[in-house]
Amino acid sequence: MAFINSAAEDEVQFEGIKRRLRSSGITKEAVTSLGAGETLEDEFDIASTSDLASGGPVSIRSHGFVPIVVDGKITGYIPYKSNDLTVNVDGGKAAKVTKALSQLTRRTEVTDCKGDAESSLTTALSNAAKLANQAAEAAESGDESKFEEYFKTTDQQTRTTVAERLRAVAKEAGSTSGGSTTYHCSDPYGYCEPNVLAYTLPSKNEIANCDIYYSELPPLAQKCHAQDQATTTLHEFTHAPGVYQPGTEDLGYGYDAATQLSAQDALNNADSYALYANAIELKC
Protein backbone atom coordinates (compact mmCIF):
# COMPACT_ATOMS: atom_id res chain seq x y z
CA MET A 1 0.00 0.00 0.00
CA ALA A 2 1.41 3.40 -0.99
CA PHE A 3 0.84 6.58 1.01
CA ILE A 4 1.39 10.16 -0.17
CA ASN A 5 1.83 13.17 2.10
CA SER A 6 1.92 16.84 1.13
CA ALA A 7 4.53 19.31 2.32
CA ALA A 8 2.19 20.12 5.22
CA GLU A 9 2.33 16.41 6.19
CA ASP A 10 -1.35 15.97 5.34
CA GLU A 11 -2.11 12.63 3.70
CA VAL A 12 -3.29 13.10 0.12
CA GLN A 13 -6.63 11.37 -0.48
CA PHE A 14 -6.46 8.14 -2.46
CA GLU A 15 -8.98 8.22 -5.32
CA GLY A 16 -8.48 4.69 -6.62
CA ILE A 17 -10.13 1.42 -5.64
CA LYS A 18 -9.45 -1.07 -2.85
CA ARG A 19 -9.95 -4.71 -3.77
CA ARG A 20 -10.44 -7.76 -1.60
CA LEU A 21 -8.82 -10.88 -3.05
CA ARG A 22 -9.65 -14.48 -2.36
CA SER A 23 -7.12 -16.43 -0.30
CA SER A 24 -7.43 -19.78 -2.09
CA GLY A 25 -8.10 -20.92 -5.63
CA ILE A 26 -5.85 -18.12 -6.87
CA THR A 27 -5.25 -18.33 -10.62
CA LYS A 28 -1.83 -18.14 -12.28
CA GLU A 29 -2.21 -14.67 -13.79
CA ALA A 30 -2.22 -13.20 -10.28
CA VAL A 31 1.09 -14.81 -9.28
CA THR A 32 4.66 -13.76 -10.09
CA SER A 33 7.54 -16.18 -9.51
CA LEU A 34 10.90 -14.77 -8.43
CA GLY A 35 14.09 -16.76 -8.14
CA ALA A 36 16.83 -16.06 -5.61
CA GLY A 37 18.24 -12.58 -6.18
CA GLU A 38 15.65 -11.67 -8.82
CA THR A 39 13.72 -8.40 -8.72
CA LEU A 40 10.48 -7.10 -10.20
CA GLU A 41 9.93 -3.56 -11.42
CA ASP A 42 6.58 -1.90 -12.02
CA GLU A 43 5.41 1.62 -12.76
CA PHE A 44 2.33 3.53 -11.66
CA ASP A 45 1.35 7.16 -11.99
CA ILE A 46 0.43 8.58 -8.59
CA ALA A 47 -1.32 11.51 -10.28
CA SER A 48 -3.88 9.07 -11.72
CA THR A 49 -5.17 8.08 -8.27
CA SER A 50 -4.51 11.24 -6.22
CA ASP A 51 -5.19 14.93 -6.77
CA LEU A 52 -1.74 16.51 -7.04
CA ALA A 53 -2.83 19.61 -8.95
CA SER A 54 -1.60 21.87 -6.15
CA GLY A 55 1.94 20.75 -6.93
CA GLY A 56 5.00 21.16 -4.75
CA PRO A 57 6.94 18.59 -2.73
CA VAL A 58 5.25 15.36 -1.67
CA SER A 59 6.61 12.35 0.19
CA ILE A 60 5.78 8.81 -0.89
CA ARG A 61 6.19 5.63 1.13
CA SER A 62 4.86 2.11 0.97
CA HIS A 63 4.50 -0.72 3.45
CA GLY A 64 2.51 -3.88 3.90
CA PHE A 65 2.82 -7.61 3.25
CA VAL A 66 3.49 -9.61 0.08
CA PRO A 67 1.53 -12.89 0.09
CA ILE A 68 3.30 -16.18 -0.62
CA VAL A 69 1.21 -18.45 -2.85
CA VAL A 70 1.68 -22.20 -3.11
CA ASP A 71 -0.64 -24.29 -5.30
CA GLY A 72 -3.12 -21.43 -5.55
CA LYS A 73 -3.36 -20.81 -1.80
CA ILE A 74 -1.83 -18.08 0.34
CA THR A 75 0.47 -19.87 2.77
CA GLY A 76 2.32 -16.95 4.34
CA TYR A 77 3.42 -13.35 4.02
CA ILE A 78 6.64 -11.36 3.71
CA PRO A 79 6.55 -7.88 5.27
CA TYR A 80 8.00 -4.94 3.36
CA LYS A 81 8.67 -1.29 4.06
CA SER A 82 10.04 1.25 1.62
CA ASN A 83 12.21 4.26 2.20
CA ASP A 84 10.57 7.70 2.04
CA LEU A 85 10.83 9.27 -1.41
CA THR A 86 10.38 13.03 -1.78
CA VAL A 87 9.50 14.41 -5.20
CA ASN A 88 8.58 17.87 -6.44
CA VAL A 89 5.32 17.67 -8.39
CA ASP A 90 4.52 19.94 -11.33
CA GLY A 91 0.91 20.75 -10.47
CA GLY A 92 0.00 21.79 -14.00
CA LYS A 93 1.20 18.53 -15.51
CA ALA A 94 -0.34 16.47 -12.71
CA ALA A 95 -3.73 18.08 -13.33
CA LYS A 96 -3.64 16.88 -16.94
CA VAL A 97 -3.06 13.22 -16.07
CA THR A 98 -6.07 11.06 -16.87
CA LYS A 99 -7.64 9.82 -13.67
CA ALA A 100 -7.87 6.06 -13.22
CA LEU A 101 -11.53 6.44 -12.25
CA SER A 102 -12.48 9.39 -14.44
CA GLN A 103 -15.21 7.34 -16.10
CA LEU A 104 -17.15 7.30 -12.84
CA THR A 105 -18.23 10.88 -13.35
CA ARG A 106 -19.81 9.89 -16.66
CA ARG A 107 -21.89 7.03 -15.30
CA THR A 108 -25.56 7.36 -16.23
CA GLU A 109 -27.03 4.04 -15.16
CA VAL A 110 -26.22 1.20 -12.79
CA THR A 111 -27.93 -2.17 -13.07
CA ASP A 112 -30.10 -2.93 -10.04
CA CYS A 113 -29.73 -6.09 -7.97
CA LYS A 114 -31.88 -8.92 -9.27
CA GLY A 115 -32.56 -12.60 -8.70
CA ASP A 116 -30.02 -14.74 -6.86
CA ALA A 117 -27.55 -11.87 -6.52
CA GLU A 118 -30.13 -9.71 -4.77
CA SER A 119 -31.05 -12.55 -2.42
CA SER A 120 -27.40 -13.27 -1.61
CA LEU A 121 -26.56 -9.64 -0.94
CA THR A 122 -29.64 -9.15 1.24
CA THR A 123 -28.55 -12.13 3.34
CA ALA A 124 -24.96 -10.89 3.44
CA LEU A 125 -26.02 -7.45 4.65
CA SER A 126 -28.15 -8.97 7.40
CA ASN A 127 -25.32 -11.27 8.47
CA ALA A 128 -22.76 -8.46 8.30
CA ALA A 129 -24.93 -6.31 10.57
CA LYS A 130 -25.26 -9.16 13.06
CA LEU A 131 -21.54 -9.95 13.06
CA ALA A 132 -20.55 -6.29 13.34
CA ASN A 133 -22.86 -5.73 16.32
CA GLN A 134 -21.54 -8.84 18.08
CA ALA A 135 -17.96 -7.78 17.45
CA ALA A 136 -18.66 -4.22 18.60
CA GLU A 137 -19.97 -5.49 21.92
CA ALA A 138 -16.97 -7.79 22.32
CA ALA A 139 -14.57 -4.98 21.44
CA GLU A 140 -16.05 -2.68 24.03
CA SER A 141 -16.46 -5.04 26.95
CA GLY A 142 -15.44 -8.56 25.94
CA ASP A 143 -12.34 -10.70 26.39
CA GLU A 144 -9.24 -8.47 26.45
CA SER A 145 -6.89 -11.19 25.21
CA LYS A 146 -9.11 -11.93 22.21
CA PHE A 147 -9.21 -8.25 21.30
CA GLU A 148 -5.43 -7.98 21.69
CA GLU A 149 -4.95 -10.97 19.36
CA TYR A 150 -6.37 -8.95 16.47
CA PHE A 151 -5.69 -5.33 17.44
CA LYS A 152 -2.43 -5.68 19.41
CA THR A 153 -3.48 -3.62 22.39
CA THR A 154 -6.04 -3.52 25.18
CA ASP A 155 -6.05 0.28 25.32
CA GLN A 156 -9.58 1.46 26.06
CA GLN A 157 -9.54 4.21 23.45
CA THR A 158 -8.63 1.69 20.75
CA ARG A 159 -11.37 -0.65 21.93
CA THR A 160 -13.86 2.22 21.78
CA THR A 161 -12.78 3.20 18.26
CA VAL A 162 -13.06 -0.38 17.01
CA ALA A 163 -16.50 -0.70 18.60
CA GLU A 164 -17.67 2.59 17.08
CA ARG A 165 -16.50 1.60 13.60
CA LEU A 166 -18.18 -1.80 13.85
CA ARG A 167 -21.44 -0.26 15.05
CA ALA A 168 -21.30 2.15 12.12
CA VAL A 169 -20.86 -0.83 9.80
CA ALA A 170 -23.81 -2.59 11.42
CA LYS A 171 -25.97 0.50 10.97
CA GLU A 172 -24.99 0.84 7.31
CA ALA A 173 -25.49 -2.85 6.60
CA GLY A 174 -28.90 -2.71 8.25
CA SER A 175 -30.16 0.08 6.00
CA THR A 176 -31.04 -0.78 2.39
CA SER A 177 -33.10 2.32 1.66
CA GLY A 178 -30.76 4.99 2.97
CA GLY A 179 -27.28 5.20 4.42
CA SER A 180 -24.03 6.65 3.14
CA THR A 181 -22.92 4.08 0.56
CA THR A 182 -24.08 2.68 -2.75
CA TYR A 183 -23.71 -1.10 -2.97
CA HIS A 184 -23.74 -2.78 -6.38
CA CYS A 185 -24.56 -6.46 -6.82
CA SER A 186 -22.31 -6.57 -9.88
CA ASP A 187 -19.32 -4.75 -11.37
CA PRO A 188 -20.52 -1.57 -13.11
CA TYR A 189 -17.02 -0.17 -13.67
CA GLY A 190 -15.06 -3.17 -14.91
CA TYR A 191 -12.59 -3.60 -12.03
CA CYS A 192 -13.39 -7.22 -11.18
CA GLU A 193 -10.16 -8.80 -12.34
CA PRO A 194 -9.58 -12.53 -11.71
CA ASN A 195 -9.41 -13.40 -7.99
CA VAL A 196 -11.16 -10.18 -6.86
CA LEU A 197 -14.12 -10.78 -4.54
CA ALA A 198 -15.30 -7.20 -4.19
CA TYR A 199 -13.97 -3.66 -4.25
CA THR A 200 -14.62 -0.25 -2.74
CA LEU A 201 -14.21 3.24 -4.17
CA PRO A 202 -13.64 5.24 -0.96
CA SER A 203 -13.78 8.63 -2.69
CA LYS A 204 -17.29 7.77 -3.96
CA ASN A 205 -18.46 5.57 -1.05
CA GLU A 206 -19.37 2.87 -3.56
CA ILE A 207 -18.96 -0.90 -3.15
CA ALA A 208 -19.29 -3.55 -5.84
CA ASN A 209 -19.34 -7.33 -5.69
CA CYS A 210 -17.59 -9.50 -8.27
CA ASP A 211 -18.86 -12.78 -9.71
CA ILE A 212 -16.71 -14.95 -7.43
CA TYR A 213 -18.25 -13.26 -4.38
CA TYR A 214 -21.32 -15.34 -5.20
CA SER A 215 -19.72 -18.45 -6.70
CA GLU A 216 -16.77 -18.98 -4.33
CA LEU A 217 -17.90 -17.68 -0.93
CA PRO A 218 -20.43 -19.20 1.49
CA PRO A 219 -22.90 -16.86 3.22
CA LEU A 220 -21.14 -17.50 6.54
CA ALA A 221 -17.87 -19.31 7.18
CA GLN A 222 -17.89 -22.39 9.39
CA LYS A 223 -14.12 -22.23 9.89
CA CYS A 224 -12.06 -19.71 11.84
CA HIS A 225 -10.51 -17.00 9.67
CA ALA A 226 -12.08 -18.29 6.45
CA GLN A 227 -13.59 -15.86 3.97
CA ASP A 228 -17.34 -15.56 3.41
CA GLN A 229 -19.86 -13.15 1.97
CA ALA A 230 -20.75 -11.51 5.29
CA THR A 231 -17.22 -10.64 6.39
CA THR A 232 -16.26 -9.59 2.86
CA THR A 233 -19.14 -7.11 2.94
CA LEU A 234 -18.09 -6.01 6.43
CA HIS A 235 -14.50 -5.60 5.19
CA GLU A 236 -15.64 -3.38 2.31
CA PHE A 237 -17.85 -1.20 4.52
CA THR A 238 -14.86 -0.36 6.73
CA HIS A 239 -13.10 1.09 3.68
CA ALA A 240 -15.85 3.66 3.07
CA PRO A 241 -15.31 6.96 4.91
CA GLY A 242 -19.03 7.65 4.61
CA VAL A 243 -19.57 4.79 7.06
CA TYR A 244 -16.86 5.78 9.53
CA GLN A 245 -13.96 8.21 9.15
CA PRO A 246 -11.27 7.61 8.28
CA GLY A 247 -11.87 4.62 6.03
CA THR A 248 -9.56 1.66 6.57
CA GLU A 249 -6.64 0.55 4.40
CA ASP A 250 -5.47 -2.87 3.20
CA LEU A 251 -2.30 -3.29 5.23
CA GLY A 252 -2.48 -7.03 5.90
CA TYR A 253 -4.70 -9.68 4.29
CA GLY A 254 -5.60 -12.81 6.21
CA TYR A 255 -4.93 -13.88 9.78
CA ASP A 256 -1.16 -14.34 9.52
CA ALA A 257 -0.50 -10.91 8.01
CA ALA A 258 -3.13 -9.02 10.01
CA THR A 259 -1.86 -10.30 13.35
CA GLN A 260 1.70 -9.19 12.53
CA LEU A 261 0.64 -5.54 12.29
CA SER A 262 1.34 -2.89 14.90
CA ALA A 263 -1.57 -1.65 17.00
CA GLN A 264 -1.81 1.52 14.91
CA ASP A 265 -1.86 -0.38 11.62
CA ALA A 266 -4.30 -3.02 12.90
CA LEU A 267 -6.72 -0.26 13.87
CA ASN A 268 -6.66 0.96 10.26
CA ASN A 269 -6.66 -2.46 8.56
CA ALA A 270 -9.91 -3.65 6.98
CA ASP A 271 -9.23 -7.36 7.37
CA SER A 272 -8.55 -7.01 11.10
CA TYR A 273 -12.23 -6.13 11.55
CA ALA A 274 -13.45 -8.95 9.30
CA LEU A 275 -11.24 -11.50 11.05
CA TYR A 276 -12.24 -10.30 14.52
CA ALA A 277 -15.94 -10.45 13.64
CA ASN A 278 -15.48 -13.99 12.33
CA ALA A 279 -13.62 -14.97 15.50
CA ILE A 280 -16.33 -13.61 17.78
CA GLU A 281 -19.06 -15.36 15.78
CA LEU A 282 -17.30 -18.75 15.78
CA LYS A 283 -15.68 -18.38 19.22
CA CYS A 284 -12.24 -18.93 17.73
From Swiss-Prot:
Binding positions (Zn(2+)): H235, H239, D250
Cofactor-binding details, from the entry: Binds 1 zinc ion per subunit.
Active-site residues, record numbering mapped to chain: E236
Enzyme Commission number(s) from the entry: 3.4.24.39
Keywords for the protein's UniProt record, in alphabetical order: Cleavage on pair of basic residues, Disulfide bond, Hydrolase, Metal-binding, Metalloprotease, Protease, Secreted, Signal, Zinc, Zymogen
Catalysis performed (reactions): Preferential cleavage of bonds with hydrophobic residues in P1'. Also 3-Asn-|-Gln-4 and 8-Gly-|-Ser-9 bonds in insulin B chain
Keyword Hydrolase recorded: yes
Cofactor(s) needed: Zn(2+)
Described function: Secreted metalloproteinase that allows assimilation of proteinaceous substrates. Shows high activities on basic nuclear substrates such as histone and protamine.
Protein name (database record): Neutral protease 2 homolog AFLA_119780
Record organism: Aspergillus flavus (strain ATCC 200026 / FGSC A1120 / IAM 13836 / NRRL 3357 / JCM 12722 / SRRC 167)
